[in-house]
């Protein structure tokens, strides 16, 4: 008599699935959790790292008996990529992104060796050892995840479809978006997960580099300004242009706001007669790229494409013999910021201080102070220094250190009807203004300390509506539903004693003139003593020939979208509008 043993079918185990998830999630979500807990960014990174790390479950589901081998091979790749990203964050306090790749590829050999040397410290070695030990421990806990046939194929396809194929199908075939844009969006979502941050980062870097190269080649082919003259003399000089971000003057005590949000600039204004505060300057577009395409070029609302066909302010200053510098705390290589990088690359030397993956991350503008001091020491006889700040860009609470929330919980001088979340945002914005005040004042003081021959101009690219206009429920910027606070900006001019001695001018009669930032290049040319075919003194706010014209705002590429700023209704009279 023969006995037959029936081999039991392996059973599905939730515990085995849990360990598999924990193993693959570990390599990406740990860093995202650290970033979130430290308050440097929100929850999107955690969400996307969890989702796209789950793709590695597919081969585990399909070949359960080989889970240890599969997990080891994949794990080595994930370990290397995620450890590099973790160490980068520990050293620099920033996520790895395509901006990092841009800076790395643009870095010379000496700078690259200094950069890599940061990775070889006892602290980093200990972190790497601990990280590796946890990864190995999780690997030892892995057990086969048995899903009966054909369900293992169904579940695997569902994962692939839900995370990859569905977004592609929806955007490409249903929403009719270009396939390239669909891939860009998907790559952006996958970026927090290892090793996608390197793969998608490189893909996005190449995409932006191609666009960047094309725009730079077109700019380099532009003819110089005709009949160009520099009538400012032959003395060595330094000119500084500081570009702020999302700062509306109505929330600055410098402009009459009852909260003391600009104490350092207030003090400078009272004690330094060479600091001139212009009261009636507005921006033409409430978006960074769009306004700088006008403010830094000859383009304006009526001629928005001139930035493509005529030299920029940076080109103009190089034509005048200036050595030019660009120091930025804005993101470098993103689809949105390509034009900023084009502008920066029109200068001789660039300092990119912000390689964050997202703008909604903690990055403080004090980053620019050290390179600014370094550039001030450069021996070039004629220097132009452009400093681009993050200013008071949303999220406002990420623009200043957590322990510097002076207005947290404050209800004084607050519009009526704000709920708790709106009040927090309102106060965060004032805290951001307070920190921005310190940065701008520090730049002026550092410049002044060098006993320079020159001047400094500061303006914000656009304003920001933060529950200022009744019914006090709007926050942000919307060109199709404009308010005054989206367009009202600070505009400051500081002139040195040496410059004032050789270029004596009284600006006191100019401070209340109605002016649009779109015409900045004419004011800058006037201040710098430059003339050329196309220079128009009637469009310089500091020129005796100045003529007030309609201050157009709106999208110039949209039919009948331009409107006169001065026809907008006033908000509450809490500050200068």
Swiss-Prot record:
<dbReference type="InterPro" id="IPR040423">
    <property type="entry name" value="PEA_transferase"/>
</dbReference>
<feature type="transmembrane region" description="Helical">
    <location>
        <begin position="154"/>
        <end position="174"/>
    </location>
</feature>
<feature type="transmembrane region" description="Helical">
    <location>
        <begin position="44"/>
        <end position="64"/>
    </location>
</feature>
<dbReference type="GO" id="GO:0005886">
    <property type="term" value="C:plasma membrane"/>
</dbReference>
<dbReference type="InterPro" id="IPR047787">
    <property type="entry name" value="EptC/CptA"/>
</dbReference>
<dbReference type="InterPro" id="IPR000917">
    <property type="entry name" value="Sulfatase_N"/>
</dbReference>
<comment type="pathway">
    <text>Bacterial outer membrane biogenesis; LPS core biosynthesis.</text>
</comment>
<feature type="transmembrane region" description="Helical">
    <location>
        <begin position="69"/>
        <end position="89"/>
    </location>
</feature>
<keyword id="KW-0808">Transferase</keyword>
<dbReference type="GO" id="GO:0016776">
    <property type="term" value="F:phosphotransferase activity, phosphate group as acceptor"/>
</dbReference>
<keyword id="KW-0812">Transmembrane</keyword>
<feature type="transmembrane region" description="Helical">
    <location>
        <begin position="17"/>
        <end position="37"/>
    </location>
</feature>
<keyword id="KW-1133">Transmembrane helix</keyword>
<feature type="transmembrane region" description="Helical">
    <location>
        <begin position="119"/>
        <end position="139"/>
    </location>
</feature>
<comment type="similarity">
    <text>Belongs to the phosphoethanolamine transferase family. EptC/CptA subfamily.</text>
</comment>
<keyword id="KW-1003">Cell membrane</keyword>
<dbReference type="InterPro" id="IPR017850">
    <property type="entry name" value="Alkaline_phosphatase_core_sf"/>
</dbReference>
<protein>
    <recommendedName>
        <fullName>Phosphoethanolamine transferase EptC</fullName>
        <ecNumber>2.7.-.-</ecNumber>
    </recommendedName>
</protein>
<keyword id="KW-0472">Membrane</keyword>
<keyword id="KW-0443">Lipid metabolism</keyword>
<keyword id="KW-0448">Lipopolysaccharide biosynthesis</keyword>
<dbReference type="Pfam" id="PF00884">
    <property type="entry name" value="Sulfatase"/>
</dbReference>
<comment type="function">
    <text>Catalyzes the addition of a phosphoethanolamine moiety to the outer membrane lipopolysaccharide core. Plays a role in the pathogenesis of E.coli meningitis. Required for invasion of E.coli K1 into brain microvascular endothelial cells (BMEC). Contributes to E.coli traversal across the blood-brain barrier.</text>
</comment>
<keyword id="KW-0997">Cell inner membrane</keyword>
<dbReference type="GO" id="GO:0009244">
    <property type="term" value="P:lipopolysaccharide core region biosynthetic process"/>
</dbReference>
<keyword id="KW-0444">Lipid biosynthesis</keyword>
């Amino acid at each position: 008599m023969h006995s037959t043993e029936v081999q039991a079918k392996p059973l599905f185990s939730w515990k085995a699935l849990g360990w598999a998830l924990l193993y693959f999630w570990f390599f990406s979500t740990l860093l995202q959790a650290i970033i979130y807990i430290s308050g440097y960014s929100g929850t999107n990174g955690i969400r996307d790292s969890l989702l796209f790390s789950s793709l590695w479950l597919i081969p585990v589901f399909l070949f359960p008996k080989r889970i240890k081998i599969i997990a080891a091979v994949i794990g080595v790749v994930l370990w290397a990529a995620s450890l590099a990203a973790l160490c980068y964050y520990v050293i620099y306090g920033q996520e790895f992104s395509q901006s990092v790749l841009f800076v790395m590829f643009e870095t010379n050999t000496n700078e690259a060796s200094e950069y890599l040397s940061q990775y070889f410290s006892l602290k980093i070695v200990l972190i790497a050892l601990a990280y590796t030990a946890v990864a190995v421990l999780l690997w030892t806990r892995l057990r086969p995840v048995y899903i009966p046939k054909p369900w293992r194929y169904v579940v695997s396809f569902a994962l692939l479809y839900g995370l990859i194929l569905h977004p592609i199908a929806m955007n490409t075939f249903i929403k009719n978006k270009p396939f390239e844009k669909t891939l860009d969006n998907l790559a952006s979502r996958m970026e927090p997960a290892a090793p996608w941050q390197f793969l998608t980062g490189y893909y996005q870097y190449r995409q932006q580099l191609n666009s960047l190269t094309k725009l730079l080649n077109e700019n380099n082919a532009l003819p110089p300004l005709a009949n160009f003259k520099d009538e400012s003399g032959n003395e060595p000089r330094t000119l500084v242009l500081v570009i702020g971000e999302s700062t509306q003057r109505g929330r600055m005590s410098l402009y009459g706001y009852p909260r003391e949000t600009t104490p350092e600039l207030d003090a400078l204004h009272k004690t330094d007669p060479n600091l001139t505060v212009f009261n009636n300057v507005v921006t033409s577009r409430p978006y960074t790229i769009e306004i700088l395409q006008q403010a830094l070029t000859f383009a304006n609302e009526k001629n928005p494409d001139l930035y493509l066909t005529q030299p920029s302010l940076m080109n103009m200053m190089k034509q005048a013999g200036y050595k030019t510098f660009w120091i930025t705390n804005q993101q470098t290589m993103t689809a949105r910021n390509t034009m900023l990088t084009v502008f920066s690359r029109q200068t001789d030397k660039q300092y990119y201080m912000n390689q964050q993956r997202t703008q909604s991350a903690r990055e403080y503008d004090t980053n620019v102070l050290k390179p600014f001091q370094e550039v001030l020491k450069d021996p070039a006889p004629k220097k132009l220094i452009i400093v681009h700040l993050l200013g008071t860009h949303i999220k406002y609470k990420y623009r200043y250190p957590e322990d510097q929330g002076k207005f947290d919980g404050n209800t004084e001088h607050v519009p009526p009807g704000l709920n708790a979340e709106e009040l927090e945002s309102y106060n965060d914005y004032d805290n951001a203004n307070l920190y921005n005040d310190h940065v701008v004042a520090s730049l002026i003081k550092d410049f002044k300390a060098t006993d320079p021959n020159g001047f400094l101009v500061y303006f914000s690219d656009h304003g920001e509506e933060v529950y200022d206009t009744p019914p006090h429920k709007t926050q942000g910027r919307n060109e199709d539903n404009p308010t005054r606070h989206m367009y009202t900006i600070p505009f400051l001019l500081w002139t040195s004693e040496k410059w004032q001695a050789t270029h004596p001018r009284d600006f006191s009669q100019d401070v209340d003139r109605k002016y649009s930032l779109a015409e900045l290049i004419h004011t800058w040319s006037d201040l710098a003593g430059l003339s050329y075919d196309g220079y128009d003194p009637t469009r310089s706010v500091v020129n005796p020939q100045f003529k007030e014209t309609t201050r157009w705002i709106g999208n110039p590429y949209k039919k009948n979208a331009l409107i006169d700023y001065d026809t907008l209704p006033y908000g509450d009279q809490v500050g200068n509008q």
